[in-house]
A protein has these predicted regions:
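Non-ligating segments of multi-cofactor redox enzymes
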Residues: 1-191
Length: 191
């Protein structure tokens, strides 16, 4: 049996992150760890250590799909791991992230007001006001939280859907962070 490490339990972090965001939207900022740490490790380590060992979301999909048998364990369609789909999804994802940052800027500039809602699948507006008390922080900080949590929750739901339909970690085949870190590693290894 393989020895367990502390990082084998980071799937708990994924659950805690989403639970905290459900109770207080400002905890959404913790998700920046999942954005910055993989890039930092790829740039300075030249590998995908985060994806292979530290990704709580990937571990959660493994737990649910394999250990709890929530996955059909069907082969992942090849197009989901194809270069055109992965980079296309990355571009789409970064566009949505850029739009979220722009909306945050508009709130900070006073051009629009705070929207106390999250958007699932970048389309469906879900009231989420109970998670924030107006005036706790400046409006732009709260706006970023709502937008970022929307992005994180949508990607979790997409990951759960493909986990149920295919292999437990199908999300990892086209995860935007995985695609970016893979690109960074390829560039670093050419040096």
């Amino acid at each position: 049996m393989k020895a367990k490490h502390w990082y084998d339990y980071l799937w708990v972090y994924a659950i805690i992150y989403f639970a905290l965001g459900f109770s207080n939207i400002l905890f959404a900022w913790l998700g920046m760890i999942d954005f910055l740490l993989p890039l930092f490790l790829a740039i300075f380590g030249g590998n995908k250590f985060f994806c292979n060992h530290l990704c709580g979301r990937g571990q959660l999909f493994s737990k649910l799909g394999t250990d709890l048998k929530c996955s059909r364990c069907k082969p992942t369609p090849r197009w989901m791991s194809s270069k055109w789909f992965r980079y296309g999804f990355l571009i789409f994802f970064l566009t949505m992230f850029g739009n979220m940052v722009f909306q945050t800027y508009l709130v900070a500039a006073g051009a629009t007001s705070l929207r106390e809602a999250i958007k699932l699948f970048w389309t469906f507006r879900v009231p989420w006001g109970w998670t924030y008390t107006a005036g706790t922080v400046t409006d732009w900080v709260a706006q970023f939280s709502f937008g970022f949590y929307s992005l994180m929750l949508t990607s979790l739901l997409l990951g759960l859907i493909v986990m149920v339909l295919y292999m437990p970690r199908t999300w990892c085949a086209f995860c935007p962070m995985g695609t970016m870190t893979q690109g960074i590693c390829k560039l670093k290894n050419k040096e």
